[in-house]
Amino acid sequence: MRLILLSGLLLLGTFLANGHDTDPEGQMLNSVIESVMILQREFANLKHAFLTVHKARSFGSGSERLYVSNKEIGKFEALKEICDQAGGHIPSPQFENQNKAFANVLERHNKEAYLVVDDPANFTNWAAGQPNEADGTCVKADTHGSWHSASCDDNLLVVCEFYFIL
């Protein structure tokens, strides 16, 4: 994309250098070039701002994943839909630092939330005596980040997981 823009600008520069910048088409072309250059700078600034915020959030949590709550509560299927619509998903911590970042959200709100455990899981943080399918087929995390079997009909805090591929 940049190569095409640069090639176009080079050809345009050659055209304008031949004295065509005084006619209406040349002036319009100059205006378009200026607009493209402004848009390129704005895009670079937005990209830098986004990456700075992402790095700051990652630095604070120790995780490349971001765990966010909208403070609502609900059952598993409703929460799954909320997270899907937001572009995220129900948390699925794969490492201890991700589980800690998730637990920080739960501790801040003093509530439990659903999570999804991959099968087979690379990382688990089951509480003593867990999992216990008699308690349910879903999994919830407490405010300390320990995992427990739970009913999928429990009303728990909405927490969605987001991650960026950079």
From Swiss-Prot:
Gene3D superfamilies in UniProt:
Mannose-Binding Protein A, subunit A
Indicate what this protein is called per its UniProt record: Phospholipase A2 inhibitor clone 02/03/06/07
C-type lectin domain segment(s): 46-161
Q: How does it assemble?
A: Homotrimer; non-covalently linked.
Native species: Lachesis muta muta (Bushmaster)
Provide the glycosylation site positions.
Answer: N122
The protein's UniProt keywords, in alphabetical order, are:
Calcium, Disulfide bond, Glycoprotein, Lectin, Phospholipase A2 inhibitor, Secreted, Signal
Q: What taxonomic classification does the UniProt entry list for its organism?
A: Eukaryota, Metazoa, Chordata, Craniata, Vertebrata
Where are the disulfide bridges? C83-C160, C138-C152
Quote the cellular component terms of the Gene Ontology held in the record.
Answer: extracellular region
One MF term in the entry's GO annotations = phospholipase A2 inhibitor activity
Output the InterPro entries linked to this UniProt entry. Answer: C-type_lectin-like (IPR001304), C-type_lectin-like/link_sf (IPR016186), C-type_lectin_CS (IPR018378), CTDL_fold (IPR016187)
Q: Function of this protein? A: This phospholipase A2 inhibitor binds directly phospholipase A2 in the presence or absence of calcium.
Q: Which family does it belong to?
A: Belongs to the alpha-type phospholipase A2 inhibitor family.
Q: Any signal peptide, and if so, which residues?
A: 1-19
The subcellular localization recorded is:
Secreted
The record's tissue-specificity note reads: Expressed by the liver.
